[in-house]
Amino acid sequence: MTDTGFCHDFIDHFDEQARNLLFYGDTGVGKTFLTNCVARELLNTSHTVIYLTAFHLVDILQNNTFGNDDMDDSDENMFHYILDCDLLIIDDLGTELNNAFVTSQLFLCINERLLARKSTIISTNLSLDELQNEYSERIFSRLISNYEIMLILGDDIRIKKAISD
């Protein structure tokens, strides 16, 4: 099945079962584009979708745990929205500063969504080996056993576009 066919299947059967996708591949091959296409289609059918970069997700998780003076009610509720939305998209996993706290909070987020049968799409430039080395065995195990994993191959579209312009 092609990358776009895979995404169409995910969208067409979204309400039938919770599915999780992990897109990995080099920079600029279209992972974020694919996640945004899925998001647009699901938003058009009145599903709730939250798109966050991994860096922004970690920021929200830190604010939820430790709080800060700049937090308002919407920031406080964001953690609950992350867990409850129909589709959570975590873009560029591996770009955030990783430590024990981040790993534990990421595990909490992934695991709670799995238990609630809520769909998640994760994109990363890391290889599967790098994911395994960067994150805990518990996170990697859940990704491998509960996510449909797709390697996205191709040339860097942004570089090709810049060269042709």
Model-based region annotation:
Residues 1-21:
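Pre-Walker A (pre-P-loop) alpha-helix and adjacent loop at the N terminus of AAA/AAA+ ATPase modules
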Residues 4-5, 18, 43, 47-84:
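Short glycine-rich substrate-engagement loop in P-loop NTPases that contacts/grips substrate
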Residues 15, 43, 114:
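Conserved ATPase "switch" residues in P-loop NTPase domains
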Residues 17-35:
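Walker A/P-loop nucleotide-binding motif
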Residues 33-46:
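P-loop NTPase Walker A phosphate-binding motif
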Residues 47-48, 84-87, 116-122:
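Loop/turn-to-beta-strand initiation segments
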